Amino acid sequence: MQVRRPLAILPHIGHLYSLVIADIFARYQEILQPNRHVEFLAGTDEHGLKIQKAAEAKGLAPDVFCSQLSDQFRRLANKAQISHSLFMRTTQRSHYKTVESVWRQLNSQGLIYKSNYSGWYSITDECFYTDAQVTTTSNSNAVISSNSSSNLNPVDSLPPVSATAVPSTTISLESGSAVEWHSEENYMLRLSAFQPSLLTHYTQSSTIFPPQHQHDIVEILSSGPLEDLSISRPRSRLAWGVPVPDDPEQTVYVWFDALLVYLSGIGYPWQAGTGLGISSGWPVNLQVIGKDILRFHAIYLPAMLLALGLPLQERLLAHAHWTIEQKKMSKSLGNVADPFEAMDKFGVDVVRYYLARVGGRFRDDVDWSQTQLDKHHKEIQSMLGNLFLRITSLKIQNRLIGVLSRTLQEIHQDSEEGSSNRFLISALLELPDKFKASMDNLEVSDALAAIIDVLRLANKTVNDTAPWHGSTLPEDVYATYTITLETLRIAGICLQPFIPDTATRLLEALGVDVEDRVWENVQVDMGKKGVKKVLGVRLF
């Protein structure tokens, strides 16, 4: 599991989104295979021209500036209960060694050459664009600093280096960022050498999700020869970065550098004969990125991996962005949502739930809304929190005294056809397969919906049977109580990746041992029998 953080003065909600989505899948794997170690890499990309200029503007040395910013993302990850096992910074010496090793390996294969290169350069995106990838706009409010909610553009949410009203601006069609014409001597990577292999890979496997993104990559690879990639910048223009091995007048291109953090984080280059590599976390099972940096991860990184003789990523999740009133979040527009403020106001798990429930389809951009956040807070509070308090009320507990115990199997058989109890047990029996299928297909929102649907049915069952009411037969009180607690137990296990603190408190209150909070215990215990007194706790 791998996700990286760009640097920012203050992280916005899009940064938290990527971390939470990656964390959900990491925690899911820990539940699914508790004996398998999950390596979860997060971190910050800290080189590049924009960082260099921003540090200069603040009168700080770049390393001091980067340390301050990286600390913000560590704080974000810690507050959001992100379960990363590794946090890498591209300014670490171990990362420099990885970049230098990869450069030398590619150079020794004749894949790197020096050439004069001209193109449209974006400081924000830290890359060159061709004539076909840019356009001229007469918009006087052209955005100089484009702050996407993706999480791998190294400096996507730093304040603009300059933001000046201009009569016309040349911008990237892909990102909307301003570009300037540059001509300079750079080192180039023979990207076209890997085009046939990449095209074969993507036409024979389902690697990228959502599928439309894989279609886009196949179209790029099929539409004509790939241009070789500029992988260095003159030291005179970019001093803040990894020096090119054996050429101190050149600095390694920030994306060549940044993409290799996936390898440096798990110790590449591995020493021969150590057995490391696959056992250390490669190939990665899943990378979580923003859709705007897809080509870096779907073309550039795989080309480098092929050159190194390493297997490609197994799956690549390129999620959509969070917007404000259908506009991309941008400090220059003043519409950046503060994740710390949201978590302080609504609670960490409520924000995590909202990001997954609303943003878990990944196909289309989603609008960040305080109103919607409040709505989903009430949803999970009602469906889960209130259900737990209702079914464990003292009035219902007292009605269970002396009642004859029955198993869930017996309750199911004794329930009338079409009754709420029978519907709930049937839905609960189907939940594990529905949930797992959605998670395995990277459909986070659908997985949550499956849980909420069962919880909603459990609430209906409690309403229909009214176990607190004196007219309800004791055996019906017992049936509803037993089924509802089993629903909460299974829902609690499934909800651990999404709302870990709340799920833990629920399972503790239900008396579920830690070793029993894994996938093999998600199946309905149809043989469960006996009244168990449970004291409800407030979850939200």
Residue ranges of model-derived segments:
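N-terminal, positively charged nucleic-acid-binding surface of large information/translation enzymes
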Residues: 1-201
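Short acidic (Asp/Glu) and glycine-rich catalytic loops that position anionic groups and cofactors
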Residues: 80-82, 322-323, 332-333, 358-368, ...
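A glycine-rich, aromatic-flanked flexible loop/lid motif
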Residues: 354-360, 387, 391, 398, ...
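Long, amphipathic alpha-helical stalk/connector segments used for oligomerization, subunit docking
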Residues: 367-372, 376, 380, 394-421, ...
